[in-house]
């Protein structure tokens, strides 16, 4: 919806400010932390609703976020998540989708800072082509066997950039 689109735009501005001047490792760490928060929110509807409820006080949300994630993510990620919780969302799941998008963009920024963005783009394209051309690969990737999927992706991406592995996984 319209609220989530506006919030996505505001979120990207905040992410750009967060990665401006950062080194590749810091941008990649931010990506990992945003993926972590998105994963927690994707599996916990109550937390997701608490963070997207427009009737909840911003200070209460910030305290909740700090309590929940303060020891698990860095200050930059904590600040971004707090800021995102203050925005309007058309649906609670939109916050998760935007967090995942920001995590991808942070990892792309890390690759760009490291001078590897073209390589990462090529590797992702090659991996996507491999997945698209193989029914067996697609079946393996859609199975519930997480360890088997991780091993398969690692085998396919052997020698690939760390950013590529993170983004494809």
Protein language model features and the residues they cover:
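Elongated, mostly alpha-helical coiled-coil "stalk/stator" tethers of large membrane protein machines
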Residues: 1-169
